[in-house]
């Protein structure tokens, strides 16, 4: 049976996600920014939390873990790196591992850059990827602990996923990402279409996520750092994809 995925807001701009397996009743939260909204969503749907899938150690992604584990006795799954940084982890995972949520299978991708321990969870059967703060819609995460080549390599891992997969990211940053992207890639028709959609969704107080990866591959300038046209726009003709990506990220940092 297909996963039932719910999207809601935690903190000010974090996305909360619940993934429910109708066949077994198992329910996972991807990260746990804070407990309250997750508990309310669980109660509204009559679900019990069985698992938390942690993507990285930043507090705005793990702040609710301890309270949820105490309340539900759920299993906490997290990246193998930085063992001391994430408390309450029961199962540590690495690239290529497969995690079961009931009968649902999540494949682990190591996607470092934003942090060194960052992982993404890919539900192949449900055509969904939870990329947290590595890949945003029309953007990507800041590179706090890794390097630009490392982050670019992580984006390439995500870019290889099929076009019909849906991206679920960590934050509602799409409107600001679109604003920046249009300064670099103003003639991109896919980007302009996404910009119009984002304006409509936000005006209706609706989330801009999920989004198809195929659309992101066309519209997200950070996924196109190896496109010679982007290098030309940045006056970096002949530069490597890693160099172009680094320049894009530096410009976004200052925007």
UniProtKB/Swiss-Prot annotation:
EC number: 3.1.2.6
Residues involved in Zn(2+) 1 binding: 56, 58, 114, 133
Known cofactor(s): Zn(2+)
Keywords assigned by UniProt, alphabetized: Hydrolase, Metal-binding, Zinc
Transmembrane segments: none
Cofactor note: Binds 2 Zn(2+) ions per subunit.
Pfam hit, one: Lactamase_B
SUPFAM superfamilies in the record: Metallo-hydrolase/oxidoreductase (SSF56281)
Pathway field: Secondary metabolite metabolism; methylglyoxal degradation; (R)-lactate from methylglyoxal: step 2/2
GO biological process, one term: methylglyoxal catabolic process to D-lactate via S-lactoyl-glutathione
Source domain of life: Bacteria
Enzyme class: hydrolase
Binding site for Zn(2+) 2: 60-61, 133, 171
Family from the record: Belongs to the metallo-beta-lactamase superfamily. Glyoxalase II family.
Function comment: Thiolesterase that catalyzes the hydrolysis of S-D-lactoyl-glutathione to form glutathione and D-lactic acid.
Known partners and oligomeric status: Monomer.
Name of the protein in question: Hydroxyacylglutathione hydrolase
């Amino acid at each position: 049976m297909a996963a039932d995925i719910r999207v809601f807001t935690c903190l000010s701009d974090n996305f909360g996600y619940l993934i429910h397996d109708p066949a077994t009743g198992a329910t996972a939260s991807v990260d746990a920014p804070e407990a309250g909204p997750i508990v309310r969503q669980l109660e509204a749907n009559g679900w019990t939390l069985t698992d938390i899938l942690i993507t990285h150690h930043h507090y705005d992604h793990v702040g609710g873990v301890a309270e949820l584990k105490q309340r539900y006795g759920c299993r906490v799954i997290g990246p193998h790196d930085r063992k001391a940084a994430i408390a309450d982890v029961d199962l540590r995972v690495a690239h290529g591992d497969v995690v079961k949520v009931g009968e649902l299978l999540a494949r682990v991708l190591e996607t470092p850059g934003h942090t060194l321990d960052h992982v993404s969870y890919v539900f192949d059967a449900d055509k969904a990827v939870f990329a947290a703060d590595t890949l945003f819609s029309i953007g990507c995460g800041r590179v706090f602990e890794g390097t630009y080549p490392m982050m670019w390599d992580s984006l390439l891992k995500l870019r290889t996923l099929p076009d019909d997969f849906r991206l679920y990211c960590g934050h509602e940053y799409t409107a600001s990402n679109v604003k920046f992207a249009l300064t670099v890639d103003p003639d991109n028709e896919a980007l302009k279409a996404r910009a119009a959609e984002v304006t409509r969704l936000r005006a209706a107080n609706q989330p801009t996520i999920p989004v198809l990866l195929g659309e992101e591959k066309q519209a997200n300038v950070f996924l196109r750092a190896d496109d010679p046209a982007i290098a030309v726009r940045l006056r970096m003709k002949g530069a490597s994809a890693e160099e172009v990506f680094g320049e894009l990220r530096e410009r976004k940092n200052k925007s």
